[in-house]
């Protein structure tokens, strides 16, 4: 049976057919409002690795722990002078994949997988629960996600497009954290820091919230030009998978896509094109 024959479309949104051209065997994309899926297409039930979209769930678990009083966002964590807030916002000074700091906290926006592993270890100590268990009972199960953590807190989630869209709905209209906590998480932390946005080069500034990457005025970027500057989310890239989820609070929409193909020029060009086409079509 051909891939096209197995695909599901919840309602006709022509823009979603762009994913047929992506260089992947299993690919899916969709759009949701705060309350329900608007459209989805592709291998929507296929599970694959989310890559760094995982960091949004790790950040959400941390925000829940902060609301519960298990930790404080401004308590020390990570290298000397760093806090939980620094780790969440890639401002701790830790390198991409090394425990050795590249700078002082609050000095530069250094995207760091290591920082999220350190954050998860800190969360586990403060909650007295293994990180994976806290994530499961605090985030995955309450949202009804079938996603599972099968690696580290920086990139180990495996799940479906539907799981990602469900998190997008949560990030539009939160049920697990207070609205004011989400507002703080989607507000730039340590304003003015420059840094490299992986795959898209140096950004000045490279705005980031608490886990959520902020679109702001970045160019080039993986979201579309029709996305509002208030858009937030994350993309993921690891060998054999490329994923994204964005949440646009001005449009009251979230979109996600998953593909079992490594990130490359097809994604850097195709994701913004898809995003713009979705926004143009759905909001006509």
Question: What are these model-predicted stretches?
Answer:
Residues 2-49, 54, 107-108, 124-129, ...:
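Catalytic loop of the DD-peptidase/beta-lactamase superfamily, centered on the K-T-G motif
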Residues 8-9, 60, 95:
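Intrinsically disordered, low-complexity segments enriched in polar/charged small residues
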Residues 25, 31, 85, 101-102:
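N-terminal core-entry segment
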Residues 49-53, 57, 65-101, 111, ...:
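Active-site helix/loop module of the DD-peptidase/beta-lactamase fold
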Residues 57-60, 114-120, 162-166:
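Well-ordered alpha-helical segments within folded domains of soluble proteins
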Residues 94-95, 116, 261-263:
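Solvent-exposed loop/turn segments at secondary-structure junctions
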């Amino acid at each position: 049976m051909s891939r096209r024959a197995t695909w599901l479309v919840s309602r006709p949104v022509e823009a979603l057919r762009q994913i047929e051209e992506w260089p992947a065997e299993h690919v899916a994309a969709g759009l949701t409002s705060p309350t329900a899926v608007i459209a989805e297409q592709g291998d929507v039930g296929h599970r694959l690795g989310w890559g760094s979209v995982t960091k949004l769930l790790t950040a959400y678990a941390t925000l829940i722990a902060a609301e519960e009083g298990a930790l404080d966002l401004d308590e020390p964590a990570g290298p000397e002078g760093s806090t939980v807030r620094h780790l969440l916002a890639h401002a701790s000074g830790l390198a991409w994949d090394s425990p050795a700091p590249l700078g002082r906290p609050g000095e530069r926006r250094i995207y760091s997988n290591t920082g999220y592993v350190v954050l998860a270890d800190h969360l586990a100590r403060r909650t007295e629960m293994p990180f994976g268990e806290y994530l499961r009972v605090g985030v995955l199960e309450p949202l009804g996600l079938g996603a599972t953590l099968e690696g580290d807190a920086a990139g180990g989630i495996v799940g479906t497009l539907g799981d990602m869209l469900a998190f997008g709905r949560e990030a539009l209209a939160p049920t697990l954290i207070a609205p004011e906590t989400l507002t703080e998480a989607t507000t730039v932390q340590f304003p003015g820091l420059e840094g490299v946005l992986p795959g898209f080069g140096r950004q000045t500034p490279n705005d980031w919230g608490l886990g959520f990457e902020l679109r702001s005025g970045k160019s080039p970027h993986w979201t579309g030009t029709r996305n509002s500057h208030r858009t937030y989310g994350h993309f993921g890239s690891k060998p054999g998978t490329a994923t994204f989820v964005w949440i646009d609070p001005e449009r009251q929409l979230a979109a996600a896509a998953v593909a079992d193909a490594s990130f490359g020029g097809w994604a850097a060009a195709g994701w913004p094109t898809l995003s713009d086409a979705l926004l143009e079509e759905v909001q006509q």
